[in-house]
């Protein structure tokens, strides 16, 4: 996914009220950008970090910029990280259209935001191709506390735990369901940050036990764009250690 307009570079001053970030642009101008990220953003929101913003083309929008990327000093080195949690669903849809997601090859249709379970909406429902429909839940990941190991979540994630329970219900009823973790940075493996949210950890393990599938993909991240790139193993007990290969 290429950014439609060139990103604008700045330096982070502060991130506050979860969804706001003050940034100093290269010319010294201070702007407030929308931060589409409800998480703690551990290790990603230090003052002085180099950031990239996307300018809005909507003249009626209150904030003229959205925070897209941060160049963070993570364990293992400096790298660009995508922090916009609105991007992963679009990245999955793009990879689906390009037949890059091996577990979903053969399906013809990817419908977003389909109601299911008790009171949830699944990110995607795949259908067609003579295959059983598959409920797909997408999670964004940008936490790294050990070199090469991506983790989720970076804060309590009660809603995500409920999603795992709903996916488990789909499989228990005879359907197919999967979790796709989109890691908006380079990493060699994925695991649950169980010390941060043991409830989500238990919910995912229970889902895996009944047959919910789980896959994790890193992304190629840079000023020009973000794209799903490489599958990596999931270290959570009950998940397969063999990553699902991208195709194409």
From Swiss-Prot:
Alphabetized GO MF terms: DNA binding
Organism superkingdom: Bacteria
A Pfam family reported for this protein in Swiss-Prot or TrEMBL: SfsA
InterPro entries tied to this protein: SfsA, SfsA_C, SfsA_N
NCBIfam families in UniProt: sfsA
Family the entry assigns: Belongs to the SfsA family.
Protein name as annotated: Sugar fermentation stimulation protein homolog
Organism: Methylorubrum extorquens (strain PA1)
Designated gene of the protein: sfsA
């Amino acid at each position: 996914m290429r950014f439609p307009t060139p990103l604008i570079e700045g330096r982070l001053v502060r991130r506050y009220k979860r969804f706001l970030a003050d940034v100093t642009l290269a010319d010294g101008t201070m702007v407030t950008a929308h931060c589409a990220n409800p998480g703690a953003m551990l290790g990603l929101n230090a003052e002085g970090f180099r950031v990239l913003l996307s300018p809005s083309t909507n003249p009626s929008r209150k904030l003229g910029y959205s925070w897209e990327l941060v160049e963070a000093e993570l364990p293992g080195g400096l790298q660009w990280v995508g922090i916009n949690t609105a991007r992963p669903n679009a990245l999955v849809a793009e990879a689906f259209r390009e037949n890059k997601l091996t577990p979903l090859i053969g399906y013809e249709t990817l419908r977003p935001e389909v109601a299911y379970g008790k009171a949830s909406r699944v990110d995607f429902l795949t259908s067609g191709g003579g295959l059983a429909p598959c409920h797909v839940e997408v999670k964004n990941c940008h936490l790294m506390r050990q070199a090469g190991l991506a983790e989720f979540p970076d804060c309590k994630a009660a809603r995500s735990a409920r999603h795992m329970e709903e996916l488990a219900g789909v499989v228990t009823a005879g359907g197919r369901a999967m979790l796709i973790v989109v890691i908006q940075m380079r990493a060699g493996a994925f695991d649950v940050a169980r010390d941060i949210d043991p409830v989500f950890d238990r919910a995912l393990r229970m889902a895996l036990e009944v047959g919910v599938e789980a896959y994790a993909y890193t992304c190629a991240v840079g000023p020009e764009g973000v794209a799903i790139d490489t599958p990596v193993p999931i270290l959570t007990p009950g998940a397969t250690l063999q990553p699902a290969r991208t195709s194409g």
